[in-house]
């Protein structure tokens, strides 16, 4: 389908004939033909989405059969959230790459909901993301590592360092948070609502990596994994603030489809991270 979509002029005649037959069998128009080429219709896009997932699994199976079990070649497709990558997965990837340099690592940056959807669609082997992560059978979730988040502010908030702020009091200061479509926003929105306060950030960041620079620029207070803020706090670039309430711990977790067969490389990497808990 993608070959035909990209073809131009009178080339790829046989592919076009095959697609014409498919359109007749389905009774659907899959392509809109113009002088400059062809484009997928809505029906064509829907068909392609299913074919793509099936082809991905077929190609993975072919790779596994060709490479055997020696782990000298192969590939792993991993969906990972930015926080999980920074505070957990990087060390595991480095160790695996040193042990199996012939394995091709495909790392996809996703939010937790996006990564879970990719596992469900069979587009990736598994996901390493942060909680909360909503999964339904046949997907499964394994907790890998807990972590805590802290409240930080720029140096202009140094006067608050000796105080204990409540969730309600935080509302009086500008807030920085990840976007509303993320599980991190939902996590803190639930906490704020439990204390009778609405989470209404003044600045919404696209990724966790953006939060620390925004705090340093004095745009507001923010919650961030302690490991990611440690150096900045130590160097007094930002201020760690105390909360009256204890925040729940969060977790880095592995999400996989128990019905989706993994190639030998993916099996080995999954085994390593699960056994290292």
Residue ranges and their predicted role:
Residues 111-124, 130, 184-241:
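Hydrophobic hinge/microswitch elements
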Residues 88, 239-277:
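A late-sequence structural motif
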Residues 1-14:
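Single conserved hydrophobic/aromatic residue that forms the stacking wall/gate
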Residues 138-175:
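Flexible hinge/capping segments at coil-to-helix
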Residues 159-160, 174-195, 262-266, 270, ...:
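Secondary-structure junction motif
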């Amino acid at each position: 389908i993608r070959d035909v979509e990209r073809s131009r002029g009178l080339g790829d005649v046989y592919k076009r004939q095959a697609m014409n037959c498919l359109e007749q069998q389905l009774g659907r128009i899959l392509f809109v033909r113009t002088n400059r080429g062809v484009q997928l219709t809505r029906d064509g896009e829907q068909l392609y989405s299913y074919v793509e997932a099936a082809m991905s699994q077929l190609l993975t199976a072919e790779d596994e059969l060709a490479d055997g079990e020696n782990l000298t070649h192969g590939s792993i497709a991993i969906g990972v959230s930015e926080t999980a990558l920074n505070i957990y997965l990087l060390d595991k990837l480095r160790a695996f790459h040193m042990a199996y340099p012939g394995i091709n690592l495909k790392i996809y940056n996703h939010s937790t909901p996006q990564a879970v959807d990719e596992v469900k669609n069979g587009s990736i082997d598994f996901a390493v993301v942060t909680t909360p992560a909503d999964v339904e059978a046949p997907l499964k979730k394994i907790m890998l590592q807990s972590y805590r988040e802290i409240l930080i502010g720029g140096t202009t908030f140094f006067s608050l360092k000796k105080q204990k702020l409540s969730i309600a009091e935080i509302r009086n200061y500008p807030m920085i948070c990840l976007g509303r479509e993320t599980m991190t926003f939902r996590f803190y929105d639930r906490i704020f609502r439990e204390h009778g306060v609405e989470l209404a950030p003044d600045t919404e960041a696209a990724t966790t990596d953006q939060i620390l620079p925004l705090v340093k620029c004095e745009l507001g207070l923010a919650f961030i994994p302690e490991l990611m803020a440690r150096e900045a706090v130590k160097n007094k670039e930002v201020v760690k603030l105390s909360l009256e309430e204890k925040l729940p711990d969060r977790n880095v977790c592995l999400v996989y489809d128990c019905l989706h067969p993994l190639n030998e490389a993916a099996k080995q990497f999954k085994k390593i991270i699960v056994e290292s808990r």
